[in-house]
Curated annotation (Swiss-Prot):
Phosphothreonine PTM sites in chain numbering: 124
Coiled coil residues, start to end: 2-32, 163-234, 287-379, 446-467
Gene responsible for this protein: PNN
Protein name: Pinin
Regions of compositional bias (Low complexity) in chain numbering: 482-500, 578-632
Residue stretches of biased makeup (Acidic residues): 330-340, 427-436
Family: Belongs to the pinin family.
Amino acid sequence: MAVAVRTLQEQLEKAKESLKNVDENIRKLTGRDPNDVRPIQARLLALSGPGGGRGRGSLLLRRGFSDSGGGPPAKQRDLEGAVSRLGGERRTRRESRQESDPEDDDVKKPALQSSVVATSKERTRRDLIQDQNMDEKGKQRNRRIFGLLMGTLQKFKQESTVATERQKRRQEIEQKLEVQAEEERKQVENERRELFEERRAKQTELRLLEQKVELAQLQEEWNEHNAKIIKYIRTKTKPHLFYIPGRMCPATQKLIEESQRKMNALFEGRRIEFAEQINKMEARPRRQSMKEKEHQVVRNEEQKAEQEEGKVAQREEELEETGNQHNDVEIEEAGEEEEKEIAIVHSDAEKEQEEEEQKQEIEVKMEEETEVRESEKQQDSQPEEVMDVLEMVENVKHVIADQEVMETNRVESVEPSENEASKELEPEMEFEIEPDNECKSLSPGKENVSALDMEKESEEKEEKESEPQPEPVAQPQPQPQHQPQLQLQSQSQPVLQSQPPSQPENLSLAVLQPTPQVTQEQGHLLPERKEFPVESVKLTEVPVEPVLTVHPESKSKTKTRSRSRGRARNKTSKSRSRSSSSSSSSSSSTSSSSGSSSSSGSSSSRSSSSSSSSTSGSSSRDSSSSTSSSSESRSRSRGRGHNRDRKHRRSVDRKRGDTSGLERSHKSSKGGSSRDTKGSKDKNSRSDRKRSISESSRSGKRSSRSERDRKSDRKDKRR
């Protein structure tokens, strides 16, 4: 501990010496000793004077002067006021003037001759010539005076230019001196600040060292005192007492050792606490010094920045004053370069924009080309589809015509009992012929189709009469154009759900022609294709049905069923029928319908009936066909069995459901494209169009059903 105290004392002495050096430096800068602290009262007296406050001394002096009597007299206040005083002054002036006027009148002033001389108004020519001749001396004099004036002016000009240059130099020198003075002043301030900061730091160090020395001295005294106490035994109770026995024994020896251990532990703890306290005291000034150093660094940086700003401002001022052309040229060149760079940047930006616009235009063109190509492909594909459809229609027509010729030759041997079954189907014939009569106004060729349809339908219905009635199933509704027709069919004829795999497929194709003329020749199709819009046509392949067995059936069921259907269809046919026809057409239609239903006619009679039916009326045709067909259907129904009619009914109904579903899907998929490619729309005939659509679906169904029925009849006859 003695060594620690010595080191601390040495540090304290060094700190005192450094503090003295700092004080001397401060004294050199400020001219006074920082340790000399003047009292507060002396400062106040020096600032305020003898009065001790602001303005009090002057009042005391004034009072002293006024009391002494040697000073100026007190101001005498005029009680009358400013107006009275001004009026009195005016009066005195007037009185003085009045007194001086008579004195001036008494003294007479001497008269003086006027110096004004009247000049001659007109100068003669001689006078002017003489004046010019006499001016040679005047000219020389004027030249001399002019030269002197010019010389003086030039001298003044030179002096002014020199003076301006000198003034500029002086201003530059003064500015430099001012800058230097500011720098010196800042340096002095910085030095002074640093010195005072050093002084404060030294003073704090001295205080800490003094505290350390005091603590070290106290610690030494405590150690000396405790070193003496270690030799004694300390009691366990408090306050602790130290004692020494007169005679030592092993028990007392143990007590001495225990007390020494405890005292040594106390000494160690006290030393550790002392060292920690000294370390804390050293850490405080270190923190303060670090903060002060940081502040100094920040201040130095600020000073440097200010100096640099001052130098830059000084250079700018010098450039402005001297007007250096070189710098101006450089500035102009720099400005031009900047402008060029800006122009280059703008040009690059414009080029990029143009390139982007060109790319966009190219993309738009490519898209348009692709769209045009797609549209052309669609247009090319649509005519091909239409041509395929036409070819299929022609092939089907030829096949149907051949089959009809063969069937007419074979069916001549049918029994006459079939006439009775045709009578029961009279209402159905009337209903299905009515749409043909309604569509009669569209074209003359349609009635040929209706006549053929009647022939085929009569045979179909004759075979249906003998069939048993299956379970009715709801038929799905097609497009809204065919709703009235399908509702009537559902009332009169129930439909089966599924079709056996032996049935052939139906083809639904879109053709640009009215639907009732599917079975007509190609010569009739071409002119009507221009008149009507696009409609869907049902084409059926020639069906090949399996061998069917024959069973008898009762007549009563078929009669009641056919009559109920006939009533429903008669109601609809009456609302639509039109009364305009001729007697010759009616007779020909009756002969054609009777021949077709009884299968006793030939191909020549069918052609004559088709030509005559083109001019026939709806009402006469309905009546004649109903009478003949009813008698034939009744005669046929007697000779047919139960099972054969059931199987035929199933096949026909399934065909009808398939054709209606295919017709719907075909109309939804192909109707729009075929309408766009060919044909002109007839806006004024929407009702006729709907009727033609319904008629087309019926005609397709009738043709397929009639063919099936004929084949089944042939097979039955062979058996």
